[in-house]
C-alpha cells in the first residue's frame, strides 16, 4: 500500500529529504506556472482518507471529566510545543511518494503534514517503531526553541476512544474535507506565499497563520497564537469583528464583481488584507499588530486618496455606487477633504485621524518646548525693593555674555542656577520675566522657557522624563537660554517612601539633567517656590541651584518705592509725604498687595467722582482727568484688602497707633538704642564688616548672644511696644516662639518639635529675630521638657550668631524666674506714662477733636441730587466694517467650496465614457432636427461653464439642469428601441449625480441656501474695499460743522473763526455749569481756571450772558465786595484774634483738668479715655449740625470742659 514509507519495514530508518514550501503547496487548477509531481494514487488516497471524522456527540463524551485519558508521555508535548517559527506546516498535497536516499536527517519532512486524524492515529499507534518515528518527526529542527502547547496528543487520545462511532461519521467527514479544500483554494487564491501554521489547528481552519504581521488576531481558533505572542490592549486598539465558523461560506464561489472592484482582478492580497473568508477584508493601518506604541504616537495617516480617473491608482475609498467613481476627487486638485464640500462616510476616519495623535503627544512628544514670547514692556525699573537680587541675576546671565574673558582668565564657571523662595506676591515671577526681557534687549537674543509646577507631568509612563529631556536639549540648541520653573515644589518634591514613585523618577531625571555627565552649556535655571522646605534637598547645592534668593516682605523704603512705581503714570500721583505715610502704615503688604491697593484706591476715587455711572447702563461723557485719588481713598482701600501674609499667619510687627504714640514714643527710642548696641547687624555697614575680617577667614565678633527683655507692670503698653520694635526691625526674618505659635504649627506634632523647627529655620535665615510675647506666662505654663529643650537650643547657638532673642514680660525684676535666660543687662524696664507723655497725649487729643470740624465743613448736610452727565451718542447699529468684511469672506468661501464640488462632479462625468453622449452639445451634423425638437438643450460642458461663471448658488438649479438633460433625451429619442439605451444612460447620469451630491457637507448646503434666500452673496461697499483702519478719521471728520457744510456746497459768508468761537464758548460754559453744580469748592476753583482767557483779560467784556444763569447776580458786585473786604480786613483782624486767644485759653484750662484727673493712668486707661472723648465729640457735632450751630469749636470745647469736670468719667 505504501511501499515508499520510511516508517515501515525492518531495515534502518531512512529520513526524507526536506521539501520546500513550493513543493508542499497543493497544485492550483487555474493555470499557475508551477510544476507539480504527483503519483497515480494521489487523488485516490485523498478520496479514501476523508472518512475519518469523529461524531460531535462522541467527542463531547470523551471530553467529559471522568473520561479524559491520562497523559501518554512528556516527550511528545515538549517536542510538539514549538515556537511559531518551527511549527509543522500544513501541506495540502500528499508527498508520501517522494523519497531520497541521501541521508536520514530530515525524517520530519517525509510524513505528510496534511492528513486526516484516523490515518495519523493509525500510523502513530500501530507499532512502537512508528511511535519512535513520531517522536523523531516532532523534534525541533534546531536547539534552544521554546516549547508550546499543542493539541496533537489530545486529538490522538480522542481518536483512540472513538472507534465505536467511526462508521457513522465517515460521510460527514468527507463533506467537511471537501469544504475545507474549497476554503484552502480560496485562501491560496489570495496569497502567493505559504504561511506558517500550527498543526493542532485541525482541518476546519481554512487559512494559515500569518508570518508575523497579518492576521494573528483574526484566526477563528487563535489559542496557539495567544500563547505565542502577548496581547496588548494599547497595540490592538481597533475593534475586530470576528465571524463565527458557521457563517463562513463552505462552498467554492466565483469571484463577485464587488470583490473584483475592491481588490482588482489579481490574486494577491496586500498586507492590509485579512483572510479567512470568501473575500479579503480591508484593515485600517492602525489595526496592524506590528505597529508599536511609539509609531502610533508620532506617525500620521499616510493613506492619501488617489486621482479618481487614474486607472492604475490606488482606490482605497468606497466605490461610487456601482459606477466605479470614488470619493477622493477633491484631493486631486491639491485640496484636502475638509477644504472641499465632500462629507462621505469613509472620510470620517481619515479626517479624524490624519495629523491627530491617538495616544499621546506630537512629534516632539507633546512638550511645549517653544520659547516663550515675553512682554517687552517689563524691565527692571518696574521692580522695587529687589535691587541686590537684580545685580546677582545680571552676574549670572549678562556678564558671561558680555565679559567672558573674566571667567576664562580665572578658569571658573559662572553660576547657572538660582532658587527664588519667599512668600507669595514678593516678585519672584516678575523678576524672572524682567530678566528675560532685559536679556533679549542686551544685544544677543536669549531664549526663555517657562514651566509652571506640574506642566510636564503626564498620564503616560515615562512621558514626563521625556519632556524634561526634550526641554533641556532644545534649550542647549538655542543657548544662551533661560529655563524658569515656577512653583518648582510641585515638580521636584522631597523624595521619600511616602511619595509616589513617579515623582521620584522625575526628580532623579531633573537632577541628572541639571548637573550630570554632560555639560549644560549657557543654560540658566531659575526656580521659584514659596515652600522651600518642600523641594528635594539635592537641588539646593552648587552646580544645580548655585544661589538662593530669599524674597522677604518689603520694608518701609521698599514699599514706598513700589507705590511710586505703580502711581508714577497717574495724571495726579500722590505726594511724596502721602506715599511715605502709606508705606509706614502698610505693614506686611507684599508687592502684589500694594498694586491691588493702588487699583482699589483709584476705583473708589472714580466711584466718588462719578456715582452716576453705577445707576445707568448708558455711557456718559466723563473727564478722567478730574478724578483725583486722595488719602481717604487709600484708607478705604486698606480696609477692604487683606494682605496675603496676613491670611496664613499672624503678623507680629505693627507700628504704634496714633493714640498711644505720645505715651510710648520715648520707650521706643530707648529700646531701639539698646538693640543697636547688642544687635549691630541692624546698623552695621559694609565697610565695618570689611574691617572686622581677619586672616584665615576669621572675623571680629560683633555680636555676643543678643537678648532683650521688655519688663513692666500691668498696663505699661508692652503689647504695643514689642510689635513696634519688630516693625522697626522688619527687614529681618521674625520667628514667633509664643505658645499659640508652637501649638498651631501644622508641621509639628508636639510643641518641642515645633520649637526645634523654628530654631533651625532661624539659624538658616540669619540674621533673624526670635520673639516671645508674655514670656512670664510662657515660662510658668511650659512643662519641664519644653523648658529643657528651649534652654538646650539657646545654649547650642554660637555666641557670635546674629540671632536676637526679644521677649516681653509682666512683673518685677526681683520676681523674675527666667534669669537664666536674660541677665540684668538684657532687661529694659517700662514704666507708666509720665506727665510729659500725658501732656503730649492730650495735646494730640484736643487737636484731633477740633480737626473733625474741618472734615465736616466740606461735606453737604444731606444727600444732594446728582447732576446729569452728558451721554455719549450711540454708534450706528449697523454692522461694523470688520463684521461686513468677515461675512463677505465667509460667503465667498462657501460658494467657492460649492463650485469646487460641482466642478468635481462635472469633471467626473466628463471622464466617464458611459456618459459620452451628454458631454458636449449636439451638433447639426449628428442630429439635424435636434434644435427643432429640443428648445433648451443642455449638456455637461454647459453645466461646467455655468459652474465656472458662478451661476449656481445652490445645488437645486444644478440638479434642475441635470433633469433637463434627462427630459431632452426622452423628448428626442422617444420610446423606440434604438433610443432606449441613450435614455437609460441619461437616467443613470442623473442617479450618479444625485449620489455624488448626497455626499456633500449638509452644513455647506444649508449655508448656501441661506445665501440664496438673502438674495445672493453680500458685496463689499466701495468705502470698505480698502483698509478698514482708514475709516475712523473719515467718520470723525464727518461730525465737524465746517466739513459737512463744505460737502453740501454751502458758501460761508461769515467769519468762521469768530462764528466758531461764538458757538464754542456757550457750549463750554454750559458744560462747566452742569459739572460745577455737583463739585465742591476746590473743584469750582479748578474749573474756573479753565475758563477762556479773554474774559480774564477784559473785565468789561464779562457781561451777563443767557448761558450764565445763576451767575448773573454774582457778575456785577464782585469788584465791590472784594474792595469792601479789603477795606474791612484790618478792622476784622481784631475780633478774630480775640476769638483765637479765647479758644487757646479754654484749651489750656481743659488740658490742665485732664492732667489732674489722669494722674498715674496706665496705657489701657488712656486708650479707653481717648475713645470715649472722641465718641462724645462726634455726638456733639451731630447735635450742633441739627441745631444750626454757627460755632462748632465752642461747642467742642464746652463738651470737653463738662467732660473733665465730672469725676465719674475718670
Curated annotation (Swiss-Prot):
| UniProt keyword ATP-binding, yes or no | yes
Ranges of Acidic residues composition bias in the record: 97-109, 167-226
CDD domains referenced in this protein's UniProt entry, alphabetically: Bromo_AAA
Pfam families the UniProt entry points to: AAA, AAA_lid_3, Bromodomain
Question: Can you give the residue ranges of the Bromo domain?
Answer: 897-1000
Bias category Polar residues: which stretches? 1-11, 1080-1090
Q: Where is the composition biased (Basic residues)?
A: 276-286
Q: Which keywords describe this protein according to UniProt?
A: ATP-binding, Bromodomain, Nucleotide-binding
Q: Which InterPro entries match?
A: AAA+_ATPase, AAA_lid_3, ATAD2-like, ATPase_AAA_core, ATPase_AAA_CS, Bromodomain, Bromodomain-like_sf, P-loop_NTPase
What ranges does the record list as Basic and acidic residues composition bias? 130-146, 227-244, 1057-1070, 1108-1123, 1138-1151
Q: Which PROSITE patterns does the record associate with it?
A: AAA, BROMODOMAIN_1, BROMODOMAIN_2
Residues binding ATP:
422-429
A molecular function annotated in GO for this UniProt entry is:
ATP binding
Region Disordered, as annotated, extends over 1-32, 63-291, 856-883, 1057-1151
Highest taxon, organism lineage: Eukaryota
Question: Where are the bilayer-spanning segments?
Answer: none
The record's family statement is: Belongs to the AAA ATPase family.
Q: Please state what the protein is called.
A: ATPase family AAA domain-containing protein At1g05910
Provenance organism: Arabidopsis thaliana
